[in-house]
Amino acid sequence: MEEPEKIVSQTELDDKAQKLVEEKDADSRLRVYVGPMEKVLTAVLLIWAVFQVWANMFGTLGAVKLRTAHIMFLLPLAFTLYPTFKKERRRRRVMPVWDIALIAAAILSYGYLFMRYDAIARTGRLNSTDVWVGVVCLVVAFEAARRASGNLAIIALIFLSYFAVWGRYIPGTFGTSAFTLKRMIKALVWDTNGVLGTGAGVSATYIFVFVLFGAFLKYSGFSQFINDIALTLVGQTPGGPAKVAVIASALMGMINGSAIANVATTGTITIPLMKKTGYKKDFAAAVEAVASTGGQFTPPIMGAVGFVMAEFMCVSYTKVMLAAAIPAFLYYLSLLYSVHLEAKRLGLSGLSKENIPQAGKVLRERGHLLIPLVVLLALMFTGYTPLFAAIIAIFVTIPVSWVRKETRMDLETIVRATVEGSRSAIGVGISCIIIGVIIGSVNMTSLGLNFGNLILRVVGDGHLFLGGLMVMIMSIILGMGVPGVAAYVIVYVVAVPVLRGVGATEMAANMFCLIYACLSNITPPVAMSSYVAAGIADSNMTKTSLIAMKLGIAGFILPFFFLNNPVLLYGSTEGVAVSETIRTFATATIGVLAIAEGLSGLPMQKYSTGATALRLVTRVMLIA
């Protein structure tokens, strides 16, 4: 028998969530400045946002110079905001002296890079100054990464030391020749495969602009609109609060791109509401964790990781977005049905009518907030670039918010939205910069190719499911404790070649790695989303994670089926008839719903264990 729940205020819950997130997420441990330093920081964040929008709108800088200028803002801001150590006091009036020195080193070294890059690109020769400036560039980048995404910095250092120091001593497949310091610096700093590579490019363009767009949506009142719409749609159905959590977390998760932050933001409201309705605390925490995690691969924004995928695959973002649509829909449909079945099993009802806002009133008061999203999608589907579409959507958000007094963004709100957007782009930006080091290291040593060949020798050509199983395990392990964008890129480097080698299509291989890298957020032993949700709910972390894996079963199963049948990735396979897509979608829908039912506990009350297992196997076969 469970002990009675202690009544906790919303403020206490918010404080608790903040502490949990700070423990697992460096972005929540940012310094808070007071006095003149606060105004200076605000001004720099505003200037950075204006520069990024201007540079992406008019494109007067070349790609490399834009990336370098982006880093010249990014690193100093990281040293300003991220504490040197976890236990450091957050509230400050001035910066520590060592951070001022690091800021100077970052600006001078990357400023030198900005000025000298064209000359180096023409001649291909480095002098001693170029080499040592390159060393400083790497050192300051690693220090920023250590503060902002510690695990990622460690992984990058392992790759770097592998070919710089230890590679020559390793025999066989993973061995490599010796590299001089000059060659290493040229590859990782003075080339577009290192710190100035794809990661920096995506951070300086898509990620910054879409994070800024998400901040403007938030400050326009879009979050409240999502919550109210979810209440009107499913609030009165059995287990309504849990379904509201699923819908709200899905929509917010696709915008902010951080599963942990999403749990902390929406979970402090939805988890207590689910518990109050009658759900057990472990289940309530698991629902929030699963719903928040799926937002990272849910169109139209996909937490910015979709743009990285499009860049790597050299395809339009629209194609990636369409490919992700069916898997994301089935993931959330399965979760909603699981929540519904649990409510039925427990005999739970929905919220009373007086607690549900009227749909007409919600649409009248906040329906106009959908216009920026409609503009974004309309521009992308009519051929405009995602960058142009997002910038226009940002500018549209401001006048649209003026339609109603309740949502009106005044100058102060616009400034706050801009500052928060810039601040939110720092953590993921640092991850993207250091990802360049990982990619450059792997490319230089052929480690990814060698690793892929080793796995292919083990599984054999054409063994799609066996290769997929090995990549699934690898993706979950490499994705543990790493932000969504970084998790996908790390997995992409070593796993996509394996899947391509066993016969998967390019889109299927990339989507497979993305989904499993994201699902590491709910997979023990790390399961950071489950950890934060369990802390808010006062539930057992391991039990919460196991329930979360059961609730997110569609996410664990579907990737194997679109490896074999890429029709589930809409638009990724040419020559597929519409009727074939509809048939595959219909059978997959029936399959995931049937699996959710089989795992809900309801069939167990009527059938033996053997019969239930047989029913589950039959349902899995339906998806295929």
Task: Identify the role of each PLM range.
Residues 227-295, 301, 314, 484-517, ...:
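Hydrophobic transmembrane alpha-helices that form the pore/transport pathway of multi-pass ion
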Residues 1-124, 131-135:
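Conserved, well-structured core domains of diverse proteins
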Residues 30, 55-60, 82-93, 119, ...:
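Membrane-water interface regions at transmembrane-helix termini and the short interhelical loops
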Residues 143, 147-148, 158-173, 181-224, ...:
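Core transmembrane alpha-helical segments of multi-pass membrane transporters/permeases
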Residues 2-39, 322-424, 528-623:
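Long, contiguous bundles of hydrophobic transmembrane helices that form the permeation core
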